[in-house]
Amino acid sequence: MKNLKKLIIITGPSGVGKGTVIKELLDRNKDIWLSISATTRNPRVGEKDDLNYYFIGEERFKDMIDKKEFLEWAQFAGNYYGTPLSTVNEKIEKGFIVLLEIEVEGAKQIKEKFPESLSIFLLPPSKEELEKRIRNRGTEKEEAIDRRLSRANYEIASSNQFDFVLTNHDVDETVKEVLKIIKS
């Protein structure tokens, strides 16, 4: 892969605001492209192939694994998820900054394989604020919230393994900081 300085990893615990920060980054900078993952799971209501995910069959996914066509991949909840290498390469060659919004373990894998890539870990202002954000989504049962919070503690403890650590107090300020890092 060429010019890995244009490969930006954004990670952090669930509820930290990765999606919100990334949406703002994309709105403010047309040179940034958000990588689309491939998955074997079925599309959810409103999701579109080639926009939200590349929806592919398990046989094709496993074939892509065998051919080493993923930047990273994982199996989660009975489905496969991965970042297709060809699309990332194509966008970098066209001059885009490629952004990966990825969970912490996947981010560590990519950073290990491609140390020249740039990794940014987003922290919540506090554990209390993180819990509030997760609860305010209103989409999860207590047991799932507890799992997310427990996982967040583990992930936050590994934040020192990333190039930059930013606390997401305010989306606008966080976006400005990320843009400053990307452009430096």
UniProtKB/Swiss-Prot annotation:
It catalyses: GMP + ATP = GDP + ADP. It comes from Prochlorococcus marinus subsp. pastoris (strain CCMP1986 / NIES-2087 / MED4). One of its GO terms (molecular function) is ATP binding. It is found in: Cytoplasm. Essential for recycling GMP and indirectly, cGMP. Belongs to the guanylate kinase family. InterPro entries: GK/Ca_channel_bsu (IPR008145), Guanylate_kin-like_dom (IPR008144), Guanylate_kinase (IPR017665), P-loop_NTPase (IPR027417). This is Guanylate kinase. It is an enzyme of class 2 (transferase). ATP binds at G12, P13, S14, G15, V16, G17, K18, G19. The keyword Nucleotide-binding applies. It comes from the Bacteria. PANTHER family: GUANYLATE KINASE, GUANYLATE KINASE-RELATED. Residues 5-183 form the Guanylate kinase-like domain. Its EC number is 2.7.4.8. The gene is gmk. GO terms for cellular component: cytosol. Keywords: ATP-binding, Cytoplasm, Kinase, Nucleotide-binding, Transferase. SUPFAM superfamilies: P-loop containing nucleoside triphosphate hydrolases (SSF52540). Its main location: cytoplasm. The keyword RNA-binding does not apply.
